[in-house]
């Protein structure tokens, strides 16, 4: 079985789905089911058992095979992210935490210094830390060294739909990493997800591309199929690129044939 291993957890699906931006909870839940995703990320503010209409914890937990990964979206410092992680673990019981620290709402780029500090503390406390980062190979290695379960470099800015603009740096991270590398943010189409998997990414996280699609459940299914195809292609081994044409059939054998 070609499974995604995160800590002691094993997942057959390599598509991770976010839960923001959907028009309503019903559509979101339909998309989760259609995707077959087993790891679902949820903002801490959506854990609200006292307000059923705002709570996603109960409905998502009821889906068989789903593991929740709370995130610290909204945190602007390591201290805020650590506090959010503690609350999230208490509410959800999940050891996973996606560390998101982006202090500037104009571009939502993750703060590398605060992210590394939060990851160091949370990993030492037994969390399975999944940090959202810029595609920085040096930072990715430092996060691995402090005990993160994976690194999640951005493909492009959150919600931008610009695809994997950081492919060259992500390829370096993949080569040097001893933990799963998961592309997070910026994906617009299933073909981009397939390309990320063909590069050797362990998984992809998708949210906006599914949530704002004309038919979110159908798009979720399309992403699932693309991720599976990309992974299969990576394992099969892609042909090498060439700077010139290479014939697939003999070009000269027939010239010596007698009519």
Swiss-Prot record:
Q: Is the Transmembrane keyword given for this protein?
A: no
Pfam hit, one: ThiG
The catalytic activity, as recorded, is: [ThiS sulfur-carrier protein]-C-terminal-Gly-aminoethanethioate + 2-iminoacetate + 1-deoxy-D-xylulose 5-phosphate = [ThiS sulfur-carrier protein]-C-terminal Gly-Gly + 2-[(2R,5Z)-2-carboxy-4-methylthiazol-5(2H)-ylidene]ethyl phosphate + 2 H2O + H(+)
**Transferase found in the keyword field:** yes
Tell me which domain of life the UniProt entry assigns to the organism this sequence originates from: Bacteria
GO biological process terms, alphabetically, are: thiamine diphosphate biosynthetic process
Tell me which EC number(s) this protein carries: 2.8.1.10
Record pathway: Cofactor biosynthesis; thiamine diphosphate biosynthesis
Top-level EC class: transferase
Q: What is its subcellular localisation?
A: Cytoplasm
Gene Ontology MF annotations: thiazole synthase activity
Quote the HAMAP family the UniProt record gives: ThiG (MF_00443)
Q: Which family does it belong to?
A: Belongs to the ThiG family.
Q: What does this protein do?
A: Catalyzes the rearrangement of 1-deoxy-D-xylulose 5-phosphate (DXP) to produce the thiazole phosphate moiety of thiamine. Sulfur is provided by the thiocarboxylate moiety of the carrier protein ThiS. In vitro, sulfur can be provided by H(2)S.
Q: Quaternary arrangement and interactors, per the entry?
A: Homotetramer. Forms heterodimers with either ThiH or ThiS.
What is the official name of this protein in its record?
Thiazole synthase
Q: Please give the organism.
A: Pelodictyon phaeoclathratiforme (strain DSM 5477 / BU-1)
Gene name tied to this protein: thiG
């Amino acid at each position: 079985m070609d499974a995604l291993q995160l800590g002691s957890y094993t997942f057959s699906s390599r598509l991770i789905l976010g839960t923001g931006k959907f028009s309503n909870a019903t559509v979101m839940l339909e998309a989760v089911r259609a995707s077959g995703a087993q790891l679902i990320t949820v903002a801490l503010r959506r854990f609200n058992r006292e307000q059923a209409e705002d709570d996603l914890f109960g409905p998502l937990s009821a889906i068989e095979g789903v593991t929740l990964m709370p995130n610290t979206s909204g945190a602007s410092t390591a201290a805020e992210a650590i506090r959010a992680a503690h609350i999230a673990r208490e509410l959800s019981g999940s050891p996973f935490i996606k560390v998101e620290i982006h202090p500037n709402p104009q571009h939502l780029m993750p703060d590398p210094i605060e992210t590394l500090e939060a990851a160091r503390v949370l990993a030492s406390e037994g969390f399975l830390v999944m940090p959202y980062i810029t595609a920085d190979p040096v930072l990715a290695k430092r996060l691995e060294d402090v005990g993160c379960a994976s690194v999640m470099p951005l493909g492009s800015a959150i919600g931008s739909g610009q695809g994997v603009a950081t492919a060259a740096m992500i390829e370096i991270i993949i080569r040097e990493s001893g933990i799963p590398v998961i592309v997070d943010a910026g994906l617009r189409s299933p073909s981009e997800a397939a390309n990320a998997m063909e590069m050797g990414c362990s998984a992809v996280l998708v949210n906006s591309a599914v949530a704002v699609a004309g038919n979110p459940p159908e798009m979720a299914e399309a992403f699932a199929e693309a991720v599976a195809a990309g992974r299969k292609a990576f394992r099969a081994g892609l042909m090498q690129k060439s700077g010139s044409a290479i014939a697939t059939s003999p070009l000269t054998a027939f010239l010596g044939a007698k009519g």
